[in-house]
Amino acid sequence: MNMLLIENCCEILDSQRVPITSTNRVKGNYPYYGANGIQDYVADYIFDDELVLLAEDGGNFGSKERPIAYRVSGKCWVNNHAHVLKPKVGLDVDYLCYSLMFYNTDGLVNGATRQKLTQATMKKMQIPERNIEEQKEIVKKLNIAKSIITHRRTQLEKLDLLVKARFVEMFGDPNDTSRDKEKRHKIGELCDVTKLAGFEFTEYINYQDSGEIIMLRGLNCKQGKLILDNVKYIDRETSHKLPRSRLYIGDILMTYAGTIGDVAMVDENDKYHLAPNVAKISIINKKKLSPVFLVHLFMYSHDYIMSFVSQVAQASINMQKIRNFEYAIPSIEEQYEFEKFVQQVDKSRVAIQNDLEQAQMLFDSLMQEYFG
């Protein structure tokens, strides 16, 4: 297939970009774009057109999930972290965007700490040449797959909101410390709270890219669930040497340094181990406290949790402060009622997640077919 150079099929409008520091921005209604999307809203605009913005530096280079190019339409302002491309006659703007979204930039970007796609290199990037009818047909198919993905993600978000609404309906707002004082208990009364000590990490832990036991880091904890698309391992022997930080079904994880208050619940024995900057919260008596209730309690009390943060060089919460978290704890029967509701919602979530994965596979296969 014939290929088109970007410099031949697009007008490159980089010279019209103007960066504005955050302190000098005048708030307004026009989107202010950077490498990865909207950064702010400002009172004026530079562009008023159908454009594709391609990350220059700070982009998601090399990612298979996060694009390096995106489409903008209408009045907007663009800073100097994104190349500005306007397709010439015969090139569909959406086709251009799809062709660049996950472009393989291996060998094209430079910079050790902040990778950069220079304009000179960008001009030599190539996209498949097709007539306008073919372009529009490809865009139509990709748009359908993308709309299904968006719809399924929206459905999942609504399920999350449904669970939160049910929690608040049953138990009230956990950020409100004035209510149900007679039912309030400190987490340290109901749970063991611990972490992987610094000397333990230094002396024993050697991360591996494959292995037997997954080290659960902060990036693996999100919205009550384990996110396992980026993991490090240790061997089982090392895990057994550090019994205090081994993880078991029902343990709750909470990030306590840097990004604070992200939580997840462990769902399997003999598979995970605690990494630095993540606290392990183990329920002492599960006849008084349900792990499902507890993880949602933490999820929905972020404002309260953040009130315990120490603002030093890196924001953090120590283990004693986590033990001092104080909450109104309902009866175990009420907790189980909420847990049953969550289980019912999770059944719907599994079906929607499967549909989402199928739609994503279709989108990925189409992108591979059309753009390699």
Which stretches of residues belong to each language-model region?
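A short glycine-rich beta-alpha junction/loop motif
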Residues: K75-H81, L96, A112-E133, Y256, ...
